[in-house]
Amino acid sequence: MKYVYLFSEGNKDMRNLLGGKGANLAEMTKLGLPVPQGFTITTEACTRYYEDGEKINDEIQTEIFENIKKMEEITGKKFGDKENPLLVSVRSGARASMPGMMDTILNLGLNEDVVEVLAKKSGNARWAWDCYRRFIQMYSDVVMEVGKKYFETLIDEMKKKKGVTLDVELTADDLKELAEEFKAEYKSKVGSDFPTDPTEQLMGAVKAVFRSWDNPRANVYRRDNDIPYSWGTAVNVQMMAFGNMGDTSGTGVAFTRDPATGEKHLMGEFLMNAQGEDVVAGVRTPQPIDHLKDVMPEVYDEFVGICKKLEEHYHDMQDMEFTIEDKHLYMLQTRNGKRTAKAALKIACDLVDEGMITDKEAVMMIDPRNLDTLLHPAFDTEALKNAEEIGKGLAASPGAAAGEIVFTAEDAKTAKANGKKVVLVRLETSPEDIEGMKASEGILTVRGGMTSHAAVVARGMGTCCVSGCQEIIMDEENKTFTLGCKTFREFDEISIDGSTGKIYAGLIPKVDASITGEFGRIMAWADKYRRLRVRTNADTPKDALKARELGAEGIGLCRTEHMFFEKDRIAAIREMICSDTVEERENALAKIEPMQQKDFEALYEAMEDYSVTIRYLDPPLHEFVPTEEADIKLLAETQGKSVEQIKAIIAGLHEFNPMMGHRGCRLAVTFPEIAKMQTRAVIKAAIAVSKRKNIKIVPEIMIPLVGEVKELKYVKNIVCQTADEVLKKENFEMEYHVGTMIEIPRAALTADEIAKEADFFSFGTNDLTQMTFGFSRDDAGKFLGSYYDKKIYENDPFAKLDQKGVGKLVKMAATLGREANPDIHLGICGEHGGDPSSVEFCHNVGLDYVSCSPYRVPIARLAAAQAAIKAEN
């Protein structure tokens, strides 16, 4: 097996083996673009590294050094040589883009001897020592895990001592002194001298990149973005191009279109006399890319030509990294750029209009999960008129955020856990902050541009971000910042607008986003290709109308118990629970029936002639009884019972495992009068709206938690008998369907029997997951973190359908059900109905529809189209 490929040996179709970065470096080499040469160590080598107990075996090491020899032949330089040294960068490059998630080392191959020779030969001692101190810092941080902060402190102390504010103002002698301090810091932390042998440095760096595939921030990012652990990362070893050689050198990052809006213009930033990490890390605030034409017009023109060539070649917006070494341009990377959902839609539609791609390709270009961000609120325009604007940064990631100020990622996580909405304010963010960024409504940074870590990650997560607000004077130690003559402390309130970059004092109210234009076009294309229908889970007319606006084709799950918790209804439910006889229960239920009917009428009106599936009462009765002493006393008074009697009734409802207890169809078996009341309400509501609106309604009644066909038979008989009585009394003809949720493993295993009694199955994957795994959704959070760390699970099975186990049950039940009843309709109504990978699974096993929460309807529509296109290909 071949583990190492020169850039000249690969191409863009080898990304599974070479990773995205390696495949694209190979492709740019093939296109004849100026790429510093090098080689890629494959993802299979990474997998092998972990299989061999985190060791790089002799076979792979031999290949690495064979390719170092080939690089020496290409460049005319020699690795480890004092007189003509070959210096390299070592970078990660996974199959899927993971910006800032893994680690990079620059200037590898330097030591005391080499740096002295470089200083003499180049006549630029400052550059040579700057490269060396950077290398010591990166190697210490990435390979030996000595935190960056120790070195940053030494830099700050040196700048203070020399009376300068910027790194670039330090002289060669200052940097030489700093390099010595760095090595002393390394020795004090590691216990040995900084390595001088380039071979040792290289192998240490390669191992570190492989290790970084498994670091906590990469694991979090992978889970959030459906990137399997088994993929591994490739490693790219590339000849250094130096952007820090002086005023005719620089480095930058650019996009062929605006990643925030999708507008067709070159957007990016560059820094003179800097290395690539300076731009991405956001340590210095760079200049806009179009200023490059004033500084180096020829280099700018060459770069613009390359950008055009790359976009036309890849048929997508490109995100590129480049370095200028003494007026020579080098391309270090290209990839399909991360973009906001709004930009993704515009870019896809524009590329179709420009004739570059088809509508089918446009549908496949968009990550369905990102659509979520389009549907998020913006600030109320009237409220904005009176808002107090205190400053402005860069509009790094669109959206509106308002909340209490926190200064650390840890504080953001804690606040979120306590139900608070927060805005994370940082000098700059780093990959370690990712969990805190996820927990925040928005992110505000003092440093960094549109391509800084904060900006890129926030855009990917759909979180509002304002970056590079340099007017902020930050005091991290005391957790305060000053902006616009005002000092803000921890937990003070601010609002930030990621679409304009504006920052406001206080909380500004938000309004729902309105969706038009490109969104409609993409959704129309998606609807053209998808086979699965998309319904919504909705219990209120407001939710139902929102879902219809977003393209829902019916309600796949209406949870009737949610209607019982309103103040006027809970009293009647409690009266029913406390009743001693069937008559008393029926009297209590008679009070609820007109309320339920009214609720159902509102849903039927909202959905018109689309299907509405109504699930009968599901939760255990203990959820409806009071727990506070005052409420118990009040219930006793209204029921004409003593407090002790009520407490005895409540105690009698206690169950050791209520989620597997007296709930679902078991309630209807024990108290048939509940099912009768709900049936009357469903049918009467359907009749009333059919007459009023002159539409055909076919009610769908769903019996929950069936595990035995006889349960369904028993409850179905009650439903049909009651429905027929109502229809006869009203002298009205109406078709209605009775089906069940498949949410108990036994129901899936005996689906052929159950299908004979059911008009439809709806897979309740929340409970089916709980019962198949044998753990509770509410308690799993306590241990799932350890399971992720130990690679037992890669994803939360309640968020992403477990296709091996739970999925096998779904597939089996679908097959058995269809064999027994070819006319049966099959759907899914758990939270998984809005997860793209789960939607694809539903398409592949032949379900008829998925049902999800209103705001996830567009996600499901697009995911269903992508599933159909993939299956066709």
Residue spans for each PLM region:
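Nucleotide/phosphate-binding sheet-loop regions of phosphoryl- and nucleotidyl-transfer enzymes
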Residues: 1-387, 414-416, 420-423, 430-435, ...
